[in-house]
Amino acid sequence: MWVAKWLTGLLYHLSLFITRSWEVDFHPRQEALVRTLTSYEVVIPERVNEFGEVFPQSHHFSRQKRSSEALEPMPFRTHYRFTAYGQLFQLNLTADASFLAAGYTEVHLGTPERGAWESDAGPSDLRHCFYRGQVNSQEDYKAVVSLCGGLTGTFKGQNGEYFLEPIMKADGNEYEDGHNKPHLIYRQDLNNSFLQTLKYCSVSESQIKETSLPFHTYSNMNEDLNVMKERVLGHTSKNVPLKDERRHSRKKRLISYPRYIEIMVTADAKVVSAHGSNLQNYILTLMSIVATIYKDPSIGNLIHIVVVKLVMIHREEEGPVINFDGATTLKNFCSWQQTQNDLDDVHPSHHDTAVLITREDICSSKEKCNMLGLSYLGTICDPLQSCFINEEKGLISAFTIAHELGHTLGVQHDDNPRCKEMKVTKYHVMAPALSFHMSPWSWSNCSRKYVTEFLDTGYGECLLDKPDEEIYNLPSELPGSRYDGNKQCELAFGPGSQMCPHINICMHLWCTSTEKLHKGCFTQHVPPADGTDCGPGMHCRHGLCVNKETETRPVNGEWGPWEPYSSCSRTCGGGIESATRRCNRPEPRNGGNYCVGRRMKFRSCNTDSCPKGTQDFREKQCSDFNGKHLDISGIPSNVRWLPRYSGIGTKDRCKLYCQVAGTNYFYLLKDMVEDGTPCGTETHDICVQGQCMAAGCDHVLNSSAKIDKCGVCGGDNSSCKTITGVFNSSHYGYNVVVKIPAGATNVDIRQYSYSGQPDDSYLALSDAEGNFLFNGNFLLSTSKKEINVQGTRTVIEYSGSNNAVERINSTNRQEKEILIEVLCVGNLYNPDVHYSFNIPLEERSDMFTWDPYGPWEGCTKMCQGLQRRNITCIHKSDHSVVSDKECDHLPLPSFVTQSCNTDCELRWHVIGKSECSSQCGQGYRTLDIHCMKYSIHEGQTVQVDDHYCGDQLKPPTQELCHGNCVFTRWHYSEWSQCSRSCGGGERSRESYCMNNFGHRLADNECQELSRVTRENCNEFSCPSWAASEWSECLVTCGKGTKQRQVWCQLNVDHLSDGFCNSSTKPESLSPCELHTCASWQVGPWGPCTTTCGHGYQMRDVKCVNELASAVLEDTECHEASRPSDRQSCVLTPCSFISKLETALLPTVLIKKMAQWRHGSWTPCSVSCGRGTQARYVSCRDALDRIADESYCAHLPRPAEIWDCFTPCGEWQAGDWSPCSASCGHGKTTRQVLCMNYHQPIDENYCDPEVRPLMEQECSLAACPPAHSHFPSSPVQPSYYLSTNLPLTQKLEDNENQVVHPSVRGNQWRTGPWGSCSSSCSGGLQHRAVVCQDENGQSASYCDAASKPPELQQCGPGPCPQWNYGNWGECSQTCGGGIKSRLVICQFPNGQILEDHNCEIVNKPPSVIQCHMHACPADVSWHQEPWTSCSASCGKGRKYREVFCIDQFQRKLEDTNCSQVQKPPTHKACRSVRCPSWKANSWNECSVTCGSGVQQRDVYCRLKGVGQVVEEMCDQSTRPCSQRRCWSQDCVQHKGMERGRLNCSTSCERKDSHQRMECTDNQIRQVNEIVYNSSTISLTSKNCRNPPCNYIVVTADSSQCANNCGFSYRQRITYCTEIPSTKKHKLHRLRPIVYQECPVVPSSQVYQCINSCLHLATWKVGKWSKCSVTCGIGIMKRQVKCITKHGLSSDLCLNHLKPGAQKKCYANDCKSFTTCKEIQVKNHIRKDGDYYLNIKGRIIKIYCADMYLENPKEYLTLVQGEENFSEVYGFRLKNPYQCPFNGSRREDCECDNGHLAAGYTVFSKIRIDLTSMQIKTTDLLFSKTIFGNAVPFATAGDCYSAFRCPQGQFSINLSGTGMKISSTAKWLTQGSYTSVSIRRSEDGTRFFGKCGGYCGKCLPHMTTGLPIQVI
């Protein structure tokens, strides 16, 4: 371990050394950047695969060049890793160039400098450069980089934002691409002085408009802007076709649409010069970051950033005028960008907005240049002002571009007051300035709301047009899928070259040679292209063969369910209820799109009209700002705001514009009126979420109800009649035209001028009281205006006097009578006035009346309240209730009231009292006072909420009390002996009650005190049986046994079995059963080959699986036990047949008796590798003669040639031994073996030409001369072997070899070696050796001397062995003790293993008994009881006597018990606390000068009790309570005459005084009390003063101000005069001296109790409810300073103020930890997703079987398709090979016969929340694609015995909040099993490959598959 730490430290310091070596080679531009940084590092990124593994050094990756022709295709995904700031960063990147338009163009203005740009080169296609992704697999940590010319971009880490860029050389050139290219990385934390001066932007749209146009001309400003737009659009519309009208069709609001911001980027000359040829890559990297920020789901909308044009200005005069003034530069750029834009939306070069990136400082003034950007607010669709500028500051500029672009979308800063209302506590993209704690990748909730409102209110219509051509996306198709391996070889080595088989495909691309003279395979040390197939369902990715389904894909957002409707926005007049849904099922991830569709829905509510006299809803919203001048210059503090209707644009009708009463100035006070506010006075449409929506006169959304001409909603025009008339006579002055009554509607008055020209007749309007509303007092209103009739909601429009047709009109119902007049002056032409209006029918108006006897309303109070009847409008005929509108013209009657709830009373009641605060002496206690409802008739009292008693004065909540100074407590005896010696027992003791004076009391006197008389003891563990894990089944098939070791242990020590209960000893053997063994099956014997004499007969012998009834390969059965398939047979002797008779045999009979005969196989044609075997085959007749093969044609011909395979060996060398000499020259040696599958074989199987050296020379330091007189003796070399080269005896591999026959052609035949009996050295292998003749029949005679061995040793290396240390000390010197030692399992090289790797039965004991002899005379220590404590209070000691006794209880000398440890004879004890003296602070000196006395209070105090009698303290230690003091020297004083005063203005005095002042020797005025007043002569005169009233005011003395506890205070009385005049107010009372007061003052003494009493005290209210329903929240209460009379005061001391808020914890949301709890506590029986508290974190769990008694918990797998298990079905026909280098191929020599094959995919997995394990065998939420179901995290195959696993499993718990524990282990089962498991760094992903012949892996049965919360 320490070596690893040392190496880590060394590598760290080496990395620092390498980093520092780059620091001096900066380009001037980067050097200037570095100077502004507080920290930076230089790193060298490494390209890695997705598991973080570095690619081989031989594989050189050439980073992409910034050119249109790529040297190599860039991968769709890539990974880089580097270490900086003490952290490891891995960037997982995916190609993304979607922010570039398909028609993206680059424009150069001015002539580029020679050498920096290629004049003839077209625009570079840099789409292959840009990538985005995540850091360390964390979704919240984003990364955006360009890979061209290095890594340039930014990413977010745990500690903030980081920026990365390749380092440029000082001469401006780049470092060569390759592995050693240095990069500069720095954090956002620029140095403080630099950072504090930077702001995103300090000039907003409102400020710019404020300086250019005053607010009161807001409407004119809009009109001017509209005129300018019409001019621009009108000028261009002549040449622009209108074929794209669909693009500007108005979309439905409050629906999420995709938006496309087409942007033009302009770089000024300084930026172009600074970045040179890297400019395009740099600018587009910035825009790639911007596009990623606008893709973040926190913005709440789907917004695409599309770069359509990049303009590069090489000469300043070619671009806009740029100077230090930011506002001017912005204005110039906005004008210039219009010339670069094509207003046709379908044109590829059209842009919605434009950005200027400049290196010029952006200043708001000459002295203030701290802005990073500037833009207009909300002008994204304004072609004149949709533009912004940004100062280039490196990669950080991407965030400022995103920020300024947000302003054009109407988003304000995160510190905006509106954002504060939304409780935005953290800054995001729209932070007001750069800060250390901002999060620039995401958007605040406030910004999200701004963007959504901006788009929903129609200001982003221009962003709806999607580019006609598809946005360019990098192809996701991998290159290897287009060019297979053979095609790649042809491209690399020429036509005809193909991929080499049997080699790891994905590591390197190996290809065959095209030159016949040089056969073999070649590679360029690069892997094949990503996407090259490497097996079924697999392909190559970054040098690895991975599953095609493991790719991370973007996740598009989907809408969640609708939330409940909100409360109604209005109580009457038509309110709105809204419901929303969120894009969170799921949320968009990995760059997925935001949801598209409706996000809000609405419905009308409370549609009844408001009662008469109710304030207008918009007027009410304006009045909320009354008295608020909003920091607007010129607005008074008592301002009154009125609603503004005229002069407001159509789009702005739902904003709250209010005007200052009495003026025409109006201002925008809120961006949005409340839902349900009418859009205007002339319409019934209402505002919803800032938009004007259609509504009817019935206040219902989308209603078609309209008001008829009579003013009735939904009426039929039958309830009124029209009055018309003409007035045309006049005289000078005002003439009455017509009187319009209340209730009239549709008033229309028109005055036609004389001869169509303006004349001298003017309409005027007045109310019933004669007050003119306009044109009164011969003053005319020439312009159009709207008049609100005071006290009504009636609005009357007037056209203005300067019109040929002067008009007054109003559609509303007139609530008051008005008078129409005409003013005639000048020429006195007759006026021509036409009027018309509607009035209700008289008979209809009498049909309705008010009914004051409607239903009773609710009682105003709980007790002793009032209630009134509701007044309703009814029809006189049938008394049916109708709308109140029908009675609006009638006066409202008085309400009918009555008393209610008279059967009860509300009272304050004391329901409880606390204990007295002082147990001894005076104190106070708290009263629990609550409001109680007392039932008069029933006599019952019920507690109600305190607010019901709010009109009654609440009694004080504290009262005085007195403690009895008696304290009680429990005293105890000693504990008894424990009932058990181990495993948890119990002991007890006696208790009795005593007081503080030592007197025993009855137990009930202490019953309120806690008493402990029993407690647990000896809770340590008893010896118990322990068992190791079960071994694997001792058979590979069929029934067998498994074993384990069982021992008795105490903690970790082993004891003899006698210490444990034998009856509970676990079993050490257990039966086990595996799959049915394959066995040999024989058929019946066939007929004898002859009809007489000797012959043989054959039978079928097959290897079968009886359970599956399947025939297997013979290799599946044990060769040595194979039954014979041939035996001899003897029939009756044959009669002699002569040659003549033979010749006469029928030919047919000869043919029928012919059969095939074959010999044995020859040795393999090669010594190792793949070869052939041969044997002879011939047709023999009945006489065993060679016959024509046609005679045997009726039988199948046996094969003559057969493929054979013998593994080849390879040389393996051990470690070199130490040099044979200690100095000078020597030799070193090592062992070299020919190995095959970790087994040494004969050296003939290895190539002797490449055999490694076994010996070499070594040189050390020269030997000293003093030691060179005698030659050193030769040293024998030692052989050092590495751990993977075991030293074994040389074995002869005679597998399948033939020994030459020694007896009549007979020969030994050998079978294959069986499996090794041990996994390490010391094992044995068996094989069958039989003697056969040349025909393959069993024979009895072979040369015994040449018989091959049937048995050989085997094992890949030395076995681990038990090793143990020395015994420790015995725990006892006699009477039986134990001693222990360390016993471990380890290899000879020292590597320590777990115990189960060694033979458990041979483990040496680690604990044994010792000193079993009896102790001498069986003596022991006797312990007397403890004495009482030596101190009555405080600390003391207890003592006891301990002496040695024998078995007869006789006392002995202590030396006889020396072998036994003596118990302690004393111990510390503590009684009650001792009282102590307490001294207060010294009082002031008794004199002001000279010598005096100081005093202080000293008393005896007991901590926790308070003051006690002084006899309880030690008098000798009492502090002094008095001491002498000395003030300044006394001085002489005298009186000085200051002249005579006039008569005093005070009362009661009847003379004036000559004022005398008391002064010292230096004539300094001093206090008069130090001077003798008898020496002052007074003269006076009589005065007449008014009479006086006097009061006596008492107040507390200051003695109690700082003294709390037991002390005294004196109530001081002083007199105050009150003059009789009424002008004086109470706060001007003046105190005068006592002698002047006719009231006798009283002086009283009171006792101060605990805390000082004040004139006012803090009063607290009730705690509010917790601010959250679950988790940690805040509770608040009111804390006020109140006098005893209940008045507010400021006399309370702040340091005594109680807290006004405190934390609270509501655990409702965390109270459920299992689905069972949810089922029981919430009575839920529905399966579904619920949130559970698992180990302190809220996790979403699927609860299944909720209708059953025991529900189950399942974890939903977000990446469902990446959770699968597979048992591979193919089996190699030759299992002793691994073709295609372990990759899967469908054309393998395989059969698909594995019975257990299957493939299962999981969507949910069951978890056990108690053990925190996954139930891998629960398949409820799984889908088996084919074959058998496979448990979770399990894989296997029956493919190969050559470490070539094909079975796979995958686990991906990303997004679930859980991960696999690091303690997870996998167990292997079967034969020849091998396992390879990869784990991600965060533990959420596992990928495993398992298999054998046959074999599988599964989670360990002991630990299961443990999981834990992330």
UniProtKB/Swiss-Prot annotation:
It holds the Pfam family Reprolysin. Residues 1711-1910 form the GON domain. Its cofactor is Zn(2+). InterPro entries: ADAMTS/ADAMTS-like (IPR013273), ADAMTS_ADAMTS-like (IPR050439), ADAMTS_CR_2 (IPR041645), ADAMTS_CR_3 (IPR045371), ADAMTS_spacer1 (IPR010294), MetalloPept_cat_dom_sf (IPR024079), Pept_M12B_GON-ADAMTSs (IPR012314), Peptidase_M12B (IPR001590). Residues 468-555 form the Disintegrin domain. The precursor is cleaved by a furin endopeptidase. May play a role in tissue-remodeling process occurring in both normal and pathological conditions. May have a protease-independent function in the transport from the endoplasmic reticulum to the Golgi apparatus of secretory cargos, mediated by the GON domain. The keyword Calcium does not apply. This is A disintegrin and metalloproteinase with thrombospondin motifs 20. The active site is at E404. Its EC number is 3.4.24.-. It comes from the Eukaryota. Residues 724-846 are annotated as: Spacer. CDD domains: ZnMc_ADAMTS_like. Residues 22-253 form a propeptide. Very sparingly expressed, although is detected at low levels in testis, prostate, ovary, heart, placenta, lung and pancreas. Overexpressed in several brain, colon and breast carcinomas. GO terms for molecular function: metalloendopeptidase activity; zinc ion binding. It is found in: Secreted, Extracellular space, Extracellular matrix. Binds 1 zinc ion per subunit. Keywords: Cleavage on pair of basic residues, Disulfide bond, Extracellular matrix, Glycoprotein, Hydrolase, Metal-binding, Metalloprotease, Protease, Repeat, Secreted, Signal, Zinc, Zymogen.
